[in-house]
Swiss-Prot record:
SUPFAM superfamilies: Photosystem II reaction center protein T, PsbT
Location(s) in or outside the cell: Plastid, Chloroplast thylakoid membrane
Function: Found at the monomer-monomer interface of the photosystem II (PS II) dimer, plays a role in assembly and dimerization of PSII. PSII is a light-driven water plastoquinone oxidoreductase, using light energy to abstract electrons from H(2)O, generating a proton gradient subsequently used for ATP formation.
Protein's name according to its UniProt entry: Photosystem II reaction center protein T
Membrane topology of this protein: Single-pass membrane protein
Assembly mode: PSII is composed of 1 copy each of membrane proteins PsbA, PsbB, PsbC, PsbD, PsbE, PsbF, PsbH, PsbI, PsbJ, PsbK, PsbL, PsbM, PsbT, PsbY, PsbZ, Psb30/Ycf12, at least 3 peripheral proteins of the oxygen-evolving complex and a large number of cofactors. It forms dimeric complexes.
Transmembrane segments: 3-23
Alphabetically ordered keywords of this record: Chloroplast, Membrane, Photosynthesis, Photosystem II, Plastid, Thylakoid, Transmembrane, Transmembrane helix
Gene behind this protein: psbT
Principal subcellular localization: plastid
């Protein structure tokens, strides 16, 4: 049971970080290219 909880937390944290970086990068590219 504990192993599943730890794995779920690890995957959730990695997913949040991955999405944060993925969503933060796109807006920066067009902004720089527009200028």
């Amino acid at each position: 049971m504990e192993a599943l909880v730890y794995t779920f937390l690890l995957v959730s944290t990695l997913g949040i970080i991955f999405f944060a970086i993925f969503f933060r990068e796109p807006p920066k590219v067009p902004d720089k290219g527009s200028k």
